[in-house]
Structures are given as C-alpha cells and as structure tokens.
Amino acid sequence: TLFPYTTLFRSNSQGIYLLDYTQQKILHYDYDWKFQKDLYFPFYVSEINCIHDKIMLYTERNGEKEDYQFYLADNCGKILNRYLPRNNNWGNNTFITSNVFTQNNNSFIFAPRFNNTLYTLHDTIATPIYTLNFRDKTFPEERTNITKYDINDNKFPYIVRRNIFLCNNYLLIDYVYQDKRNFYLYDMNSHKSQNGYITNDLITDFRFFPQIVKDNKIIDWIDAASLIEYFPHVVQENPILHDLKETDNPILFIYNSK
C-alpha cells in the first residue's frame, strides 16, 4: 500500500488541493474535507499554487519533446495553458530547494528555478515583471544554462536566486554566495533596495527563513523539539513555553513589515 506523501496544500474558491508527491497526483477536497477527485498529469509536478479558481503547476524535466516548466489547469485537471518551454540540452542539476511561486492577496509572481526573470500573469499570459541584476555576479543565461553547473560548489562564481516572497509592498529574495545566505529587499513603491543579512530578533542565532507571507506579515516557524534542544533559554525565559513538549506543534514567529 502506498500512503500519500503530501508536500503542499493550497486552496481556492473550488476547495483544497493536496500535492501527493510520491504518487504524483493532486487530491481535491471541498471545505468540509469531503474527497472530490484525484487529478493526474502526464508530467512530474513538484510545486502547485492556486490562482483564483485555477491551479498553476511547476514541473520537473520529463524528457519529452513537449516539456514546459509551468502549466495552468482548471479544478478538474484540464490544461488551459503552458509557459516557458524547456531546452532539451539542459543539464541535470535542476532539483535544489527553492520556491517558484509567491502570492499575496491579488499579486502573484512566478519564476523558473534559479532564473533571474520574474513573471506575472495578465489574464492567462505570462508577462515579465522584474529582472534581477547581480552585476558581474549575474549568471550569463543568454550564453549557457545553469543546470550544467554545480551551483553548490564554492568555486561557482555567480549569485543564484533561491526563494522569492511578496509582502505587501516588498519583494524579498534570498540567495547564497560563497556559502553565506543573503537577502535582497526591494520596495516596490519607492523602488529602493537593500542587500545583506536578516537576523531573527526573537531568537538569537536562529536562522531567518520566511515560510508564509500574508499581507504585511512574514511568518516563520521552528519545531518544538529543536526549540527545546537548541534554544533552551527561550523556553525558560517565556512563561507561555514552560510546558512545551517535544511532540507539540511548531512554534510560529510572526513579523510585521514596516
């Protein structure tokens, strides 16, 4: 028997969608958690996002002649559109953790993994909205493909975008350069940007990594066992955490962007 390994869940007006990574299907439920149907696709789905009443899919290489990075489907699994075809000459270094979707209220941005061009949808048309420029550290996408390189090698000379997050009027991007994780914060109103590190002022030495962005709130979390083991002083200093057990739910940190 194969048990579902749900790696993502998303929702829209039509219900809740769970991505079963191992069996490569999307389980559709209504808001009473009544099962509706399984959605199957002829390609390998690794990330999903709901846009209004539709589902955006990000896929891995499938080796077929028709191989696109993104697909737009309706809630029944019918493909409505395809975006950004893959080059068959791409290398194999493609599966490294990074997100490809970010959404906040009515704003939606997507980008192929490690790509410096960020897109949005106008109706169902993919439209470039931002291009990242790391100056002399920008990967030369027009001359070669990043999947032919080991970007985790310390000798890799370029900066590679990892995750993207929309937070009200800000676009937050993280990248790794010479084994150090950096953040790039762009104010979409003033068009000003800042580069550097972001520290977690709630727990000293705890890494900062947004998990969810909603309105002007940036949400991070840590599992209870790790908090107890690695940051016992936090548990001792906060009365609300005194009865914390290793099996308890994760602890959330909620930040308000200024």
Model-flagged regions — what are they?
Residues 29-34, 73-77, 121-125, 186-191, ...:
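Short loop/turn segments that connect beta-strands within beta-propeller blades
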Residues 23-27, 64-72, 114-121, 177-185, ...:
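Structural motif
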Residues 130, 155-159, 236-258:
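Sequence/structural signature of beta-propeller modules
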